[in-house]
Amino acid sequence: MMSKLGVLLTICLLLFPLTAVPMDGDQPADLPALRTQDFEPERSPWFDPVRRCCSQDCSVCIPCCPPP
């Protein structure tokens, strides 16, 4: 029984190698603006200089402030 499972596992790995699974590096970035060189959250209109974070949602400005 174990040898049959081994043969089945070998066949499955040959047909569908682990390299065919997409890795995290292949996924698009959630926030492409963070990848640019000129991204400065301090210049955002929602940036709170006292708390050093943005008062808006994280999809709008990074780093976003923790909820109160």
UniProtKB/Swiss-Prot annotation:
Source species: Conus ventricosus (Mediterranean cone)
Flavoprotein among keywords: no
Protein name per the record: Conotoxin VnMMSK-01
Tissues in which the protein is found: Expressed by the venom duct.
Coiled coil regions, renumbered to chain: none
Main location class: secreted
Pfam families for this protein: Conotoxin
Keywords, sorted A to Z: Cleavage on pair of basic residues, Disulfide bond, Hydroxylation, Neurotoxin, Secreted, Signal, Toxin
Leader sequence segment: 1-20
Entry note about domains: The cysteine framework is III (CC-C-C-CC). Classified in the M-2 branch, since 2 residues stand between the fourth and the fifth cysteine residues.
Keyword match Secreted: yes
Protein's cellular compartments: Secreted
Protein family per UniProt: Belongs to the conotoxin M superfamily.
GO CC terms, sorted: extracellular region
Domain of life: Eukaryota
Molecular function terms from GO: ion channel inhibitor activity; toxin activity
Propeptide residues, chain positions: 21-50
